[in-house]
Amino acid sequence: MWKRCLAGCLCGLLLSALGGCARMVPGASGEPAGTADSGSERSEYAPYAGLWGLTAKQRQEDFAYFEQQLRENYPCWGILERNGTDYEAILDEYREMAAQTDNDFELYVAVNSALYRLGGEGHLSVIDPEWFSGFQDVYNELAENGSAEGETRERWREVLNDPVTAQNYGKLLAAVTELNAGEDSSSNPDAPAADAENVTTLIIEEGKIAYLKIDSFETYDADKEALQAFLGKVKGYEHLIIDITQNGGGSDSYWMDLLVTPLSKASLSSTNYALVRNSPNTAPYLAEAFAADVLHPISELPQLPALEPRDRELATHFVETTLETEPLGSGFDGKIWLLVSERVYSAAEAFTVFCKDTGFATVVGTPTGGDGIGIDPVYLCLPNSRLLIRYSPLFGLNPDGSSNEEYGSIPDILSPAGESPLITALRAIREG
């Protein structure tokens, strides 16, 4: 058994809170770029043609490497096939764009847009230049302080701190910033308001029903005091409703330390299977995250009724991931309800899985977005541009063997079509 890293490391990571995929092309539209024939785009990107000083051959090498490594390492091809994603046509289109362009920035656009079109399953995305330094900071801090389990994630830090990679991302950030200058952020309806509160609290019925809404598991330090105060205030209530319907992820440490530990009354443990492709790019990360005897040959995986043959075919090994918590104090005496939706992803999904496995909370709402079983996404570094592509190295399974990324978690109580999970939960409370 392996106890999952509790340091968070933006697991689910920062981009997950923005919808689970990276920014696609500079600009507020969020739409993928067209082919290399798009004259307006070529004109816009012209000042950045020599961004990294690459030759035409180097740009083509990068895209070829990107494509080859994706085929060898990415674990979610089965999901794309079941979704009807024509990934061969998508890769063909952007391979041609990378071959035709004489512009370094358009290589970034080609890779970024290809990943957008592939759908972002399993955290698949380019590391956004606007978030690069944030990832560096988190892993550098982890290296200095270690996690609760003594983990440091050295492989992750090594890739992010490569001097050429950091320099190239600095140049890319400058270009993206210049291209985005003057854009109206209001044109992106998903962009959070600058002063939006991450935590919302409400007393629905004095002494009986308390409501806590958390939109992200990223802001641990900023939210810690407010959460402690509110949970202390409602400790004697009969019901606590925790709403994560808009929560796209963040850090597992957030929900484990700030919610489960203070509210639970006993030790809790959740164990899940995950498939692994112990392939060339992924192997160094797995070697750091797992002891050798934790990686079990796929032939030893128990029979699971909903496991897709294609998913098993891609895997070389499997692991059992375990999350464990200990109570802090006397806990919450009442009943806890967790509200979820399709927007729940990554670390928020991990919380949902934990609640269902342990009974910590009754889950109410609609099926979730998934990808909450695993470890931090790993990086694929293109050799010339040093662009970083991330993907989840573990393919998490629900108890029946179905893909957690694909199907998410099914709530204990499903909300009827058109009904908010809060109304569903309040009705369940009223009906006893």
Language model: regions and residue ranges:
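Positively charged n-region of N-terminal signal peptides that target proteins for export
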Residues: 1-5
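C-terminal motif of bacterial Sec signal peptides marking the signal peptidase cleavage site
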Residues: 17-20
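Gly/Ser/Thr-rich loop/hinge elements
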Residues: 251-334, 374-379, 393-395, 403-405, ...
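Flexible, low-complexity junctional segments that flank or bridge functional domains
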Residues: 22-276, 284-291, 335, 367, ...
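Extended C-terminal subregions enriched in glycine
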Residues: 335-357, 362-370
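C-terminal regions of proteins
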Residues: 364-426
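Extracytoplasmic/peripheral linker and loop segments enriched in polar/acidic and small residues
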Residues: 87, 91, 292-305, 407-432
